[in-house]
């Protein structure tokens, strides 16, 4: 049976992280289910690589309307291996920490927590205020995995893509997919 991965893209800065994850997941035997918050397409106009939003959506096998709370991915009976919210806005963190499921991104994420399945959140906000930090702590205690979009420098990144690939590579590690899109730490002598 093919793995199903749910990807949520919010309107936070960091759209290239979500797009790159979709591109790399296509290389694996994975069924990609995508839902995006209402403002994600607007952020893509400013941060994207020039491709249309329609082209971004075409990277997924199934696209779910964020307003459709009756979508298959809104139910615990939908067998998803994991969900990644990338990037994850501060607003989405707050809604999740408060248990508010007012769109399909938040509903699907809360379902992952209640079903005890992996939920990976990639917050991109900086600086972090106390409210964001407390929300991340609350979600971490509830079982979510936090992957802040804080790239490493030990791998000597030369391009923006190197930094994007580092974060996406770490997400892939947590999903259990091997990828060589970033250099791993090999220690010192």
Q: Predicted segment positions?
A:
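A cross-family phosphate/adenosyl-ligand binding-site feature
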Residues: 2-120, 124-189
